[in-house]
């Protein structure tokens, strides 16, 4: 069909609607199909925004030689949609049209060769409406066609859609501004002071936003359009070198820096914590106040020093808990628990970490670290917390010198008293309890050694093994006759340290 169905502009230009703006959609198809057009009454807004909504990412369904006009005399601010009933492709316009001022947005889609055009007209109440802008999509590019024949454009792909915003329309000087946003509201390019129906400078790097499929009419939330201001700046390292591909985030708005380390985002008025982050660098956060004007916020990121800090007692003993902290992370939330360049072992001379055990884990997972106490190695598994560190590795069954079977009979034998009276490990509890109560003061005072650590021990020699097998009766007899002192061989050790043998007769 070749006959165009349009509504005369003369019918619009009546006294009743002289100051009323209207929305005009010109959609072009190869066949005549009805449209669903639904203006949103009383939705508020402050700008003119057009979203082109080819859900399937191609322009092939649109054809030339047939046009339709759908008009409304009640163009409240808000969201509008037009969709062919037999097609899933939808055109959306969000406009600031009210009963007093604004431009008409006319959408004219044509595609016989994968081409499309989006027309913006001003003064719908006038028979002499001017064309504000002619945005076209052709062979993978979005361009702006000017009345002087110049042809400039934006490089795009069909993977995503963009939002075109025509704003700040100045009828007196016949100027307007245009800006292109991605689906998150980040500015992809802009031009200020464009002449009506004149060429617009090119903008690069725009991806088209592909809306969710499954519905013929996309559901844009109506509501007040929030004025946004541009926040831009540069991200460098501490030497001032630009950092490309750094992430800059403020609330849910995020972008990455270009090759020059520059970024730009749009934010509504308010207070924000804006953060710059890049792998292997410490994030930097600044608080800013957005109040309707452009702001510049620069960042300087320092390299993360991959250091391990160990804080513990003088020596390692079995079942000891040692705080273990690794400060190394990046913006993806992964933590390297072993790739460090410096070990700080504060007074932990017999403890070392196996640096060859490289492990890269995400937060919340378990990290396995090899820990060596003296000459023996154990593997310790701990949780990588969301606070970016691994903490409190419990060293289970670390062999010590002397061996662990010589575990202390008295704990804290360093001040003349056995601090743990309930002996464990060798002999029954009752034997050791009685042994401790009776001879504690004698042995402790005789063999106290001032250099013994709090965790040092006293291990009896031959007599101890005899007591294990002959039982409580012989112990009582030996205590009663006082003959045990000459038989006791006492080994006193420092935790993980050398053994000292003391013979008393």
UniProtKB/Swiss-Prot annotation:
Subcellular location: Virion
Name of the protein this chain belongs to: Structural protein 27
GO cellular component, one term: extracellular space
Organism: His1 virus (isolate Australia/Victoria) (His1V)
UniProt record, GO biological process: peptide metabolic process; protein processing
Keyword Ribonucleoprotein on entry: no
Region (Hydrophobic): 20-40, 423-443, 470-490
Miscellaneous comment in the UniProt entry for this protein: The virion does not contain any lipid membrane.
Keyword set includes Aminoacyl-tRNA synthetase: no
UniProt main location, coarse: virion
Key words of the record: Virion
Molecular-function GO term, any one: metallocarboxypeptidase activity
């Amino acid at each position: 069909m070749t006959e165009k169905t349009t509504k005369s502009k003369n019918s619009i230009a009546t006294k009743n609607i002289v100051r009323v703006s209207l929305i005009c959609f010109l959609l072009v198809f190869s066949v005549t199909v009805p449209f669903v057009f639904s203006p949103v009454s009383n939705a508020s807004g402050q700008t003119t925004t057009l979203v082109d909504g080819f859900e399937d990412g191609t322009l092939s369904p649109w054809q030339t030689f047939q046009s339709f006009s759908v008009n409304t005399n009640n163009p409240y601010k808000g969201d509008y949609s037009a969709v062919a009933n037999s097609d899933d492709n939808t055109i959306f316009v969000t406009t600031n049209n009210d009963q007093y001022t604004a431009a008409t947005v006319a959408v004219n889609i044509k595609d016989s060769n994968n081409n499309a055009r989006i027309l913006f007209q001003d003064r719908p109440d006038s028979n002499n409406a001017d064309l504000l802008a002619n945005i076209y999509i052709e062979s993978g590019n979005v361009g702006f066609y000017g009345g002087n024949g110049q042809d400039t454009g934006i490089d795009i792909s069909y993977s995503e859609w963009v939002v075109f915003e025509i704003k700040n329309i100045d009828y007196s000087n016949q100027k307007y501004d245009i800006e292109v946003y991605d689906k998150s509201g980040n500015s992809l390019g802009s031009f200020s002071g464009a002449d009506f129906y004149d060429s617009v400078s090119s903008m690069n790097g725009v991806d088209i936003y592909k809306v969710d499929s499954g519905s013929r009419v996309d559901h844009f939330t109506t509501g007040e359009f929030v004025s946004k201001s541009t926040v831009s700046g540069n991200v460098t390292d501490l030497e001032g070198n630009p950092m490309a591909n750094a992430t800059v985030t403020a609330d849910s708005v995020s972008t990455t820096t270009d090759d020059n380390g520059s970024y730009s985002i749009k934010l509504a008025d308010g207070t924000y914590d804006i953060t710059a982050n890049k792998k292997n660098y410490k994030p930097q956060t600044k608080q800013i106040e957005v109040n309707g004007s452009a702001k510049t916020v620069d960042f300087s990121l320092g390299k993360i020093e991959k250091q391990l800090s160990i804080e513990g007692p003088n020596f390692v003993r079995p079942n000891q808990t040692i705080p273990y902290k690794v400060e190394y992370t990046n913006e993806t939330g992964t933590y390297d628990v072993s790739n460090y360049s410096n070990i700080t072992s504060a007074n932990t001379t017999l403890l070392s970490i196996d640096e060859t055990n490289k492990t890269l884990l995400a937060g919340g997972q378990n990290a396995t670290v090899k820990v060596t106490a003296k000459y023996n190695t154990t593997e310790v598994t701990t949780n990588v917390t969301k606070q970016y560190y691994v903490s409190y590795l419990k060293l289970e069954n670390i062999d010590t010198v002397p061996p662990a079977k010589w575990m202390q009979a008295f704990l804290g034998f360093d001040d003349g008293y056995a601090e743990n009276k309930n002996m464990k490990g060798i002999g029954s509890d009752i034997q050791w309890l009685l042994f401790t109560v009776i001879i504690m003061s004698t042995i402790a005072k005789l063999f106290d050694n001032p250099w013994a650590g709090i965790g040092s021990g006293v291990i009896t020699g031959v007599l101890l093994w005899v007591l294990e097998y002959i039982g409580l009766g012989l112990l009582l007899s030996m205590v009663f006759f006082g003959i045990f002192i000459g038989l006791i061989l006492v080994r006193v050790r420092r935790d993980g340290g050398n053994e000292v043998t003391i013979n008393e007769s």
